[in-house]
Design a protein with these regions (language model features):
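Alpha-helical transmembrane segments of multi-pass membrane proteins predominantly involved
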Residues: 1-167
Length: 167
């Protein structure tokens, strides 16, 4: 992170262009692959690929605030991902066949059995998607703010498209 946030490194146009390309591909590919998943843990893993793209978008903005924005994004992302994985792990019953409890379809109607855990999982997933009134929304807002202030319109568009796909 220190290496990427150093002004000398990102001042090189080739390095910054490479980061923009990787960020764009990461956001789009990660979200598209997450859409196709039936396994909740794999869905969260592919979502992680997209979130790395959002972090790289902030890094490529090369502003003084970028380090703070990256730190905020990573803290929010870590909290929500650990929370989501934790709830999925708790909800996975040891009595079911291996991998069966991890299917998205097996979470249908789980609210009536475990309402508190379901509410926590819902909030975590809404935050990962960047829905307003969640910490994930604030993080994505700062990612958009960083790219707009750097006049990186391509990355701003990629963040918006990636967020729309993740919904």
């Amino acid at each position: 992170l220190r290496f990427l946030l150093s002004t000398a490194t990102l001042a090189l146009p080739a390095v910054n262009t490479l980061i923009v390309v990787i960020a764009s591909l990461s956001m789009i590919i990660g979200n598209v692959l997450a859409l196709r998943q039936q396994n909740i843990k794999r869905l969260l893993a592919y979502s992680s690929i997209a979130h790395i793209g959002y972090v790289l978008a902030i890094i490529s903005a090369v502003k003084v605030e970028s380090a703070g924005f990256v730190s905020l994004y990573m803290a929010v992302y870590a909290f929500t991902t650990i929370g989501a994985f934790g709830v999925v792990t708790i909800m996975s019953s040891p009595y079911k066949r291996q991998g069966e409890a991890e299917l998205v379809e097996n979470f249908q109607g789980i609210f009536w059995q475990r309402p508190v855990l379901t509410a926590v999982l819902t909030v975590m997933l809404l935050s990962l998607a960047g829905i307003p009134l969640t910490a994930g929304f604030i993080s994505k807002f700062f990612a958009i703010f960083a790219t707009v202030s750097a006049q990186s319109w391509w990355l701003t568009a990629m963040i918006i498209v990636g967020s729309a796909i993740s919904l």
